[in-house]
Amino acid sequence: MPVLHNRISNEELKARMLAETEPRTTVSFYKYFTLEDAKTFRDNLYSQFVKLGVFGRVYVAKEGINAQISVPANRYDEFKIALFASHPALDQVRLNVAHEDDGKSFWVLRLKVRERIVADGIDDDSFDPANIGHYLKADQVNQMIDDPDTLFVDMRNHYEYEVGHFENAIEVPSDTFREQLPMAVDMLQHDKEKNIVMYCTGGIRCEKASAYMLHNGFKNVYHVEGGIIEYARKAKEQGLPLKFIGKNFVFDERMGERISDDVIAHCHQCGTPCDAHTNCKNDGCHLLFIQCPVCAAKFEGCCSQICQEELKLPQEEQRSRRAGRENGIKIFNKSKGLLQATMHIPSPEKSADEK
């Protein structure tokens, strides 16, 4: 029986990837469709992707597929043929190719079956995920963004919004997508007659969010086709002015793609303009935060002096300290509350409703 999962250590796989000289293409895609046998589909796709040397993260569920991967450039056409043939619903599925790509975005293939391809927390049998808002192409986005009767709503997490967003976009301040959905409904309760434009990184979250808004009585709901990635690609191809400012956060080793030259965020340690995310080098913390080169050198890649000092302890002592902490600390290493407490960042003066 073939092995349908990875058995090599992350360290060895990462070293192999960094030693590669062949160019790779980073690409993401998603599709909502009914998948009757997710396990069999997963195993077949895994076998195909392994043969093609695909790395990345892929989730499949009864509601479809969500993938962020890197493909050897010389096998990209083979990859497309295999993907398009894997299920009728995936024939000619839209592929979002990365803008800034050194080919080092992933080093292992992880293909998992999940309950949902995006965790939404929706538990309502009357909700119809197929009833979605209208797609907007890049030129339509630019036409609508200055309309006073149109609201652009960012359906990403706080750390994504912080480094880049559409001009005048509304942030739904939360740590997770499942928290955002009811929050967005509450925040926009008095704007049901306006045009509501949802957007996210590649389209998967804002597509479901558009269906959720329609389900909750909003009338004129839109979402950016292909998300920020596709918008930026099309805007540049067509010579359109970019209405997205800053960097697009991505969930791989790159942690971001520059869309415009604007740097709208600041180092969480010294306050200098900076939009480079990193994880604290202390594995017992692993906090996601923004750090400039000066502070990276000063704190040795750590988020604080406490973590910097802990990192210098013997390995056994570090392991002992990690074991004594709550198991959830790594799970919630992107929490805004944890970030504010660790970095001593004050909470915004205005509430979400006031904003």
Swiss-Prot record:
SMART domains: RHOD. Keywords: Oxidoreductase, tRNA processing. It comes from the Bacteria. InterPro entries: Rhodanese-like_dom, Rhodanese-like_dom_sf, Rhodanese_C, TrhO, TRHO_N. CDD domains: RHOD_YceA (cd01518). GO terms for biological process: tRNA modification. Its EC number is 1.14.-.-. Catalyzes oxygen-dependent 5-hydroxyuridine (ho5U) modification at position 34 in tRNAs. This is tRNA uridine(34) hydroxylase. It comes from Yersinia pestis.
